């Protein structure tokens, strides 16, 4: 018990608070059931028809059933401890909420007349999976603790599975759309972030003479430093970083 508590306390700050919010949402769902889901889950007919826009945010934190809560909390624990130190706490939180809200928004657009509540952080968690594949594409993970895959392969495999289920399993289309859109929006968010305007402006300012080596911008140098640290993490794990290297990684992530 003490080991589990120590492990929880060692989680990055935002990851820890998000996990607690999942737990609170699960307890509230146990107490209030369908009433909570109706008002604070994502009910497309109410979100679009009555402009209950708060549902785009609140549905993320409600979980129905112990295993629904455990799965999303486990995925948050597994991914958040790698991503939050790299992205920085504020950007990590913005990214998580963006993926959840964007996934909910697309769900409403696709099924505006649906009266079935959609609840849970799966859309946002799938966005974290996209980020994991983005930052650690070649890191080995084990699907069902048996099958070795790279992070990129895992993201592609789960995307294919969700797409197949949306076509073949009756009644699962809305939830699968939420999962898939969270993954897609997460990837697009990060790809858009690589188009760094600072790098672009630096390139415009530099008028290079023939044969002159291009100067690296400060942003490019910082990105290279971050890449070196990320490579070290992918090979030896997060624990291999010194306190100074970890602080530098947090600083570089906070600028993104």
Segments (PLM) and residue ranges:
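A detector for small-residue-rich transmembrane helices and their helix-helix packing motifs
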Residues: 1-230, 236
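C-terminal tails and terminal domains of large nucleic-acid-associated
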Residues: 226-256
């Amino acid at each position: 018990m003490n080991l589990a508590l120590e492990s929880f306390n060692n989680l990055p700050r935002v990851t820890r608070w998000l996990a607690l919010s999942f737990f609170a949402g699960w307890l509230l769902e146990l107490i209030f059931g369908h009433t909570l889901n109706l008002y604070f889950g994502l009910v497309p007919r109410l979100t679009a028809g009555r402009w209950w826009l708060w549902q785009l945010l609140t549905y993320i934190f409600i979980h129905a059933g112990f295993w629904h809560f455990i799965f999303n909390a486990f995925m948050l624990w597994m991914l958040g401890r790698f991503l939050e130190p790299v992205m920085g706490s504020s950007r990590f939180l913005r990214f998580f909420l963006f993926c959840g809200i964007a996934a909910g928004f697309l769900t409403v657009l696709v099924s505006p007349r649906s009266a079935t509540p959609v609840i849970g952080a799966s859309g946002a968690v799938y966005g974290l999976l996209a980020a994991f594949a983005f930052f650690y594409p070649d890191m080995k993970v084990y699907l069902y603790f048996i099958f070795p895959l790279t992070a990129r392969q895992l993201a592609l495999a789960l995307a294919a599975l969700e797409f197949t289920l949306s076509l073949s399993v009756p009644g699962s289309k809305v939830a699968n759309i939420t999962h898939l859109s969270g993954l897609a929006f997460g990837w697009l968010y990060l790809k858009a972030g690589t188009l760094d305007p600072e790098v672009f402006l630096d390139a415009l300012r530099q008028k290079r003479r023939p044969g002159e080596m291009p100067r690296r911008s400060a942003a490019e140098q910082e990105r290279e430093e971050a890449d070196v640290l990320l490579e070290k993490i992918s090979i030896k794990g997060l624990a291999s970083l010194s306190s100074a290297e970890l602080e530098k990684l947090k600083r570089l992530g906070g600028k993104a």
